[in-house]
Amino acid sequence: MVRGRQFLAARVYDTARAGMSSTIIQNTRPNVPMWLKALDHIPPAEVLTRPYPIQHTEPKDRGRAAQRPRNLFRPTKIVHPEDQLRQEFYRDHPWELARPKLVLELDGQDARRRDWSKGLRQPGMAVVQRQLWYMEVRGLSKARAYDVARKEFYKLRQQEEIERRVAVEEARMYGAYFGKNNLQVGMELEDAAYEQWKKWATIEISKLEAERTAAYANVVDTVTEPAEDDEEELL
């Protein structure tokens, strides 16, 4: 397995010590080479692979600056149990953010003085408070409380929509005119934008056709010109 390899360097220390032990001239000190002491501490390896020494990580001395308290005067983040519930509700119902809300409060504790056991008073943020009441008072899980409060919210929205439709029908029976709704206004704006784009597209198409016709005419002219020159030379 080790045929053709030289291992004489593995016994260089023994050879050097043996050479220094026998002196030709008596009463003289042998000249010790400088590398002999280093070779005594770090002898040559007896295997063909170099051993990898164990790496010891020294503890990092960060100094006294690391022991000082940080963010001592920074205010802590205020977290309420309703925050996560509110985030989940508005993630599932993003259009509720577009509805007008009553933001006028006395001291910011109006929601705590309400009796949430009697159902929803104002949809939206009230769904979160109703869900929290189910979790704290009734002991329901988070998903179950959200499901119950959400169904109450849908039922209340359906009642409001039915009342609104009935009121509009009754008013129209007495001759009231409400004008265009949001859907009709949006369709008119969309039609106007489409007609404007149609005019622009027609102009662009005519420009492209004119450029294509002009390019074809130039190619025909360059092909017919040499033929006319040949006829003139023959004449």
UniProtKB/Swiss-Prot annotation:
Q: Which InterPro entries match?
A: Ribosomal_mS23_fun
Q: Where is this region: Disordered?
A: 51-71
Q: Where in the cell is it found?
A: Mitochondrion
Show the GO MF annotations: structural constituent of ribosome
Q: Which UniProt keywords apply?
A: Mitochondrion, Ribonucleoprotein, Ribosomal protein
**Chief location bin:** mitochondrion
Q: What's the superkingdom here?
A: Eukaryota
Q: Name one GO cellular component term.
A: mitochondrial small ribosomal subunit
Complex and partners: Component of the mitochondrial small ribosomal subunit.
List the PANTHER family hit by this protein, alphabetically.
37S RIBOSOMAL PROTEIN S25, MITOCHONDRIAL, SMALL RIBOSOMAL SUBUNIT PROTEIN MS23
Q: Which family does it belong to?
A: Belongs to the mitochondrion-specific ribosomal protein mS23 family.
Q: What is this protein called?
A: Small ribosomal subunit protein mS23
Write down the species: Chaetomium globosum (strain ATCC 6205 / CBS 148.51 / DSM 1962 / NBRC 6347 / NRRL 1970) (Soil fungus)
